[in-house]
Amino acid sequence: MIGIDVGGANLKIVDDLGVHIHYCPLWEHAPITAQLDQYISSPDDEAVVVMSGELADCFSHKMEGISFIVDAVKKAFPHARFYGTDDLFHTKAVPQLAAANWLASAAYLKEKYPDAVLLDIGSTTADLIPLCRFADLKGLTDLKRLQNGYLVYSGMLRGNIAALLPSVVLDGITTPTSSEYFAISADAHLALGHITPADYTCDTPDRKEKNLDASLKRLARVVCADLEEIGKQGALQIAAQFWERQRELICGQVRRIAKECGTGKIIVAGIGAPLFARELNGTDLNRKLGAVAQALPAFAVREIAKRGGYF
């Protein structure tokens, strides 16, 4: 049995051999079925699936996206089952399948960490999940999670720098930023040494290199400058101020939820786990679970299915 998480940008797979992550942007007509075909060992292979890619703007509404993903997966794995926000498995496209990946993670971890707050910080978003409130989490849509502070649209790679940073201070001068798509989270985190070029798995805004010099040039454009105008230190100031804002936003929300739950226990998964676990004095699930923590929903839905005897 394999676990599959179909996101808007990434396809994550967990099987007996480990974790497999493919950059697979649905808005560019990503070949989900072709990517999955390589993991088929027999026609009767079982697969359990979660998704969040139904929100991609190539679909006119969520049910269109859900149906597309279900059909694409079933072409590779005809017996696939899909986990929903009702904490149940389904064999057909239903509304409950929309953005249920975070709930699978919660369902898997709640027994071992019943009083913890889970932060899953990925390429695009941060899921903030109070495991102590699992019963209240069922049925929550992304809209409701945004309204409750359980979903923050900022991650380690794909977010527009200007979305969090309307202005920066350069040499003591407050400088508005351009809202153009010039630089992303990955550029700031690469410049600050939080990630490596190999971790920069998404496309760059300018479709150019994924290295320090290229990231610094993209960061300079956020203030409508060439790198020569503001220098390396100026670009690093932009990166540092972005990180400060992102850290305040995400860590502040996590601490608020933990306080409401009366707990000091915080566990962290995803590509940003090492960084945010340090900031929050939390437990890095990469150390507890290994590489599967970077594809936690795919791993979790597989474990839930095995634990529940669904197959």
How should each PLM-predicted stretch be described?
Residues M1-G8, K12-L119, I129-F311:
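Nucleotide/phosphate-binding catalytic cleft detector across ATP-hydrolyzing
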